[in-house]
Amino acid sequence: MNLSRFAPSPSSDSLISTLRPRAAVRRLHSNITGPMTPFKTAVNAYVASEGTDNSYVVRPRLYNDKRAQSDGSNALLSSIGPSGTTKRPRDEMDCFTDTHKHKRGDGNKSRRREQCRANQARYRDKQRNAQQQLERSVEQLQSELSTLKHRNLDLASRQRTNQSPWNTVAEVFRLLGVCFRSPWRVTCVQEMRNHSEMRQILAILERSFTHDVAMGDLRGIDALMEQLLQFSQY
């Protein structure tokens, strides 16, 4: 078996191109002391490639420029601590959560206030209705009491008017006769009240007259009975 065809053949001179060295990016430069941040490293690499006169140095393309600036910006933003003005995504999420909780708390407070107002309004209406019902009950009781008083007076008047007028006249003459026979019994009203016959006569006369009986300028049963007692003492 012939293996000569698999042997490597020499390359042509036309396939060899000029080698161009890459621009080295270092963290330390002659004019800058101390370590640099990724942002400064990317920017210095771009500046160094622009300022060289070597035509063999490959200058970065526009895409690489923007990418370097973007990488440097991201590195700068990532290096800012919590005290910086730029907020991290988690801080924004926390802020959004706090705002949502605050709004939800305000909504709950508003609903609670509305519920309290509704409860107070119902309580005031209930108290007002109870007060009005009590006032109506009092007015009804007063009306019934007045009606009962008038009915009582009417019944008493009917009972008195059922007696014969001659019986009343007879009781008056009977009173006068007792007074003439026993004048010491009419010395005072208290003495007259102590005598049983006098009490009976006075009770019959009081039942015979109405409560608004009148005789001359006298009005009422008590005034009339007092006048009769004075007549009996002459």
Curated annotation (Swiss-Prot):
This is bZIP transcription factor 1. GO terms for biological process: appressorium formation; appressorium-mediated entry into host; cell motility. It comes from the Eukaryota. GO terms for cellular component: nucleus. Interacts with PKZ1. Transmembrane segments: none annotated. Residues 70-86 have a biased composition (Polar residues). Its main location: nucleus. Residues 134-155 are annotated as: Leucine-zipper. Residues 88-128 have a biased composition (Basic and acidic residues). Residues 106-169 form the bZIP domain. It is found in: Nucleus. Keywords: DNA-binding, Nucleus, Transcription, Transcription regulation. Required for normal zoospore movement, formation of appressoria by germinated zoospore cysts and plant infection.
